[in-house]
């Protein structure tokens, strides 16, 4: 078992040396005879190590190809010590391969290397599919290709940004956001500051109702009057004043949020009264509801609800133990960065494309398709930045300041396989409000599921149209139609999901209609309609 390179030390020492396993490499004895012998000895040891490593690699390669666990799972010395696990099958074959290999078992793997590197060794051992064939493509890991796509995406977009800056320069203008017209928007600011009067009025109505001063019917009528006035009042102010589009959008957006909160406040307290007051109390319903959430409203609860990042009222919310100041500062910095990035995308890419485009319904078809596709890429980036800045950063900032515990503001909507799944995941505050105050009440009143979904989308479409049409001061129903057309897409993607199980066809349809076609088309339509209105006014 001891190698012949150690003969210079004498046979006596080797005769009594214990036999070492073939797969363990011992340091070769120091040869005698000067520096030349030393170099020759170490060269021989190096050759043995290289031959052993090559044999092990070959064994792993051939074992993986053939599916032979014995060939791929153990070193060659182990296989040579057990005839039943050796490819040759007997000791004669091992001796022959050892002799042919020149080093027979020394360093482990001599017998296998002699067999592996012979021309007679079989290479094709079983039928196998190509990794990208239809039968094997989903069994492979494509992480490397995904990384390649990320690298290509970063490289291509970096080149486009550099090319755009070299050709057009930096197009950011302060006048695009704030101009002399913005200084005349003080009526909108005063209107915004007066909106808290409506929640205070709703609180007074609930106090009267809980004290049995007014009936439930009167309280309901007063809530309807307050909520309707709250949404009509900002609309009239925006239409009366010649305000900037951005200022009008901010006001009507805040007004819609307050309206949703008022509806939730009135509906929830009405339900609490039904459960806790008079003979309408139902024991089995109370047993399933936390009693802490069945208390009359207080002014502190109302103020917290109006500021909290939620649209659904309840007397108490899960709270965190403290405010993480360092984390909060980092989130604020990120929010400012992504807000600035949105402004850069709008002014550097979207605004020039829209200004130099034609009305999509009046120009040629190819021209409209080219403009929509040109606008789709910056629109996707803008939409993703908007989502991250608002739903992840801004709502988390509010939640951290108020120690609001439930921070599930969105789910993994980007993996949605149907349009219905997307709407249930991308905007959780609105989704919870719709389910709680529209969908389930419709179901409890005997309305079918399909009609309840239609009513939910109808309310959403009206609110979207108000948020866009009022600041632009045009009524074209583009936003309304964009939301209502989601219903046939829901049916289509649900059918595709049932027909092609566990596929991403519905996900591709979602990305196409939302980011490639839908949003750029709506943006072009509203921009040109606003420009036409301004030209007619002049």
Swiss-Prot record:
The keyword Secreted does not apply. Pfam families: MBOAT. It is found in: Endoplasmic reticulum membrane. A motif (FYXDWWN motif) lies at residues 409-415. It comes from the Eukaryota. Its EC number is 2.3.1.20. The active site is at 464. One of its GO terms (cellular component) is chloroplast envelope. Belongs to the membrane-bound acyltransferase family. Sterol o-acyltransferase subfamily. Involved in triacylglycerol (TAG) synthesis. Catalyzes the acylation of the sn-3 hydroxy group of sn-1,2-diacylglycerol using acyl-CoA. This is Diacylglycerol O-acyltransferase 1-1.
């Amino acid at each position: 078992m001891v190698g012949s390179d150690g003969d210079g030390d004498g046979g006596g020492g080797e005769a009594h040396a214990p036999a070492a396993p073939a797969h363990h490499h011992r340091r070769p004895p120091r040869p005698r005879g000067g520096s030349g012998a030393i170099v020759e000895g170490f060269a021989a040891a190096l050759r043995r190590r290289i031959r052993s490593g090559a044999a092990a690699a070959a064994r792993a390669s051939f074992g993986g190809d053939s599916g032979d666990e014995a060939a791929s799972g153990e070193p060659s010395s182990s296989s040579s010590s057990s005839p039943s696990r050796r490819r040759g099958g007997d000791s004669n074959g091992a001796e022959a391969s050892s002799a042919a290999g020149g080093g027979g078992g020394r360093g482990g793997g001599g017998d296998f290397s002699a067999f592996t590197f012979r021309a007679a060794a079989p290479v094709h051992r079983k039928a196998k599919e190509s990794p990208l064939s239809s039968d094997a493509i989903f069994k492979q890991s494509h992480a490397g290709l995904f990384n390649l796509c990320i690298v290509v995406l970063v490289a291509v977009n970096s080149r486009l940004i550099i090319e755009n800056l070299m050709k057009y320069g930096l197009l950011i203008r302060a006048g695009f956001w704030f101009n002399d017209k913005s200084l005349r928007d003080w009526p909108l600011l005063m209107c915004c500051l007066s909106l808290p009067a409506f929640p205070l009025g709703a609180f007074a109505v609930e106090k009267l109702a809980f004290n049995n001063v007014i009936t439930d019917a009167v309280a309901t009528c007063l809530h309807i009057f307050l909520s309707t006035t709250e949404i009509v009042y900002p609309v009239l102010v925006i239409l009366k004043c010649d305000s900037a589009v951005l200022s009008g959008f901010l006001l009507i957006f805040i007004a819609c949020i307050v309206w949703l909160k008022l509806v939730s406040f009135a509906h929830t307290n009405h339900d609490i009264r039904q459960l806790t007051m008079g003979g309408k109390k139902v024991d089995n319903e109370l047993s399933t509801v936390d009693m802490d959430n069945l208390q009359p409203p207080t002014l502190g609860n109302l103020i917290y609800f109006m500021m909290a990042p939620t649209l659904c009222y309840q007397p108490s919310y899960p709270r965190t133990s403290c405010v993480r100041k360092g984390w909060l500062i980092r989130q604020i910095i990120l929010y400012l960065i992504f807000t600035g990035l949105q402004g850069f995308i709008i002014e550097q890419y979207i605004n020039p494309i829209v200004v130099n485009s034609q009305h999509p319904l009046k120009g040629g078809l190819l021209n409209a398709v080219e403009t929509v596709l040109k606008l789709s890429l910056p629109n996707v980036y803008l939409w993703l930045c908007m989502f991250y800045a608002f739903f992840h950063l801004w709502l988390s900032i509010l939640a951290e300041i108020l120690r609001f515990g439930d921070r599930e503001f969105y789910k993994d909507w980007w993996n949605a396989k149907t349009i219905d799944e997307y709407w249930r995941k991308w905007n959780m505050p609105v989704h919870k409000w719709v389910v709680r105050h529209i969908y389930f009440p419709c179901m409890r009143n005997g309305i079918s599921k399909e009609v309840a979904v239609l009513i939910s989308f109808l309310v959403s479409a009206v609110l979207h149209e108000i948020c866009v049409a009022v600041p632009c001061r045009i009524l074209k129903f583009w936003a309304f139609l964009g939301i209502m057309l989601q219903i046939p897409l829901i049916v289509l993607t649900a059918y595709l999901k049932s027909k092609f199980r566990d596929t991403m066809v519905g996900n591709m349809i979602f990305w196409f209609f939302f980011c490639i076609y839908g949003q750029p088309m709506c943006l072009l339509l509203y921009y040109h309609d606003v420009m036409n209105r301004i030209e007619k006014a002049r």
